[in-house]
Amino acid sequence: MSKTLYERLGGANGIARIVDDVVEAHMNNPLIKARFVPLLERPDHLAAAKKHLRDFLGMGGGGPEKYSGRSMPDTHRGMNISAQEYMAAIDDILATLDKHKVDEQTRKDVLAIAYSLKGEIVHV
């Protein structure tokens, strides 16, 4: 039996490390950091955002987590995220997966999820 995406990402602990590193990468990315740095002023919001990301990726990857956050359109509505910003975020995700030595098929699976959400994030 093949492993789930959740298992291939290292389960809850692996996903938590990946989420932490992706958020850090976003905060250092000149194209999108203005959207993330304000979270540093609200540690409670930063913690909640990371939890939602962990739960979203965990549930989507076949893990036991339950995502209880808003829908992607509701979360991103009014932010006017450009395609360039979206791709900058994708680049951060891919670089983080490389950092964690995630195999190519798992990278493709994560990328497929990310691309499937593009219409719910960009210019909504």
Predicted segments with their positions:
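Core of compact, soluble alpha-helical bundle domains
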Residues: M1-V124
